[in-house]
């Protein structure tokens, strides 16, 4: 069963005004195809350029591309962390990106107190916040049962707008966009 529970407390580092800005969650595979990378970059830049705060989970792949693209567009971005703010950034490959987000008027937030390390359960809970604090969620690319499906399911459960990128079948291996196809065909 999905949870529709707002966090009791949020820990924040950076521009907390972004919590009141219209936001779009950009989510997807940690290993997107070239077409997935292009889509993540395009949609993040477009939304950021039009005044939306880009929300994602600072994971490798689509999440990192979403944050980077928002910054390149001089837009706003919020990274939701699955650990305390004082703990080493997960994944460690995105430590510099997290620093850049804060330095460029962005925001890092977590519902976990200081000293709390990242766990797989908390990664799922992070996905709940991504869809929960966003007007809409955009699925860039996901296999069936990919990690992005947590955010998709939370968006559906909480009746948020949900979009999936539609790819030309000859450009992308169908196995890496199966969840996109399901959503586009009207899965509910």
Language model region names:
Residues 1-188:
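Glycine-biased, small-residue-rich flexible motifs in mid-sequence functional cores and linkers
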């Amino acid at each position: 069963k999905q949870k529709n529970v707002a966090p009791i407390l949020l820990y924040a580092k950076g521009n907390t005004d972004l919590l009141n800005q219209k936001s779009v969650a950009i989510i997807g595979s940690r290993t997107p195809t070239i077409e997935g990378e292009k889509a993540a970059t395009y949609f993040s830049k477009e939304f950021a350029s039009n005044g939306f705060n880009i929300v994602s989970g600072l994971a490798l792949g689509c999440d990192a591309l979403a944050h980077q693209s928002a910054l390149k567009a001089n837009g706003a971005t919020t990274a939701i962390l699955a650990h305390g703010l004082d703990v080493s950034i997960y994944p460690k490959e995105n430590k510099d990106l997290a620093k850049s987000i804060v330095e460029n008027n962005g925001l890092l937030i977590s519902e976990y107190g200081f000293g709390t390390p990242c766990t797989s359960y908390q990664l799922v809970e992070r996905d709940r916040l991504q869809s929960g604090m966003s007007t809409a969620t955009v699925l860039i690319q996901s296999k069936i049962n990919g990690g992005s499906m947590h955010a998709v399911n939370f968006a559906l459960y909480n009746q948020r707008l949900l979009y999936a990128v539609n790819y030309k079948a000859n450009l992308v291996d169908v196995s890496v966009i199966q969840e996109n196809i399901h959503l586009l065909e009207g899965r509910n």
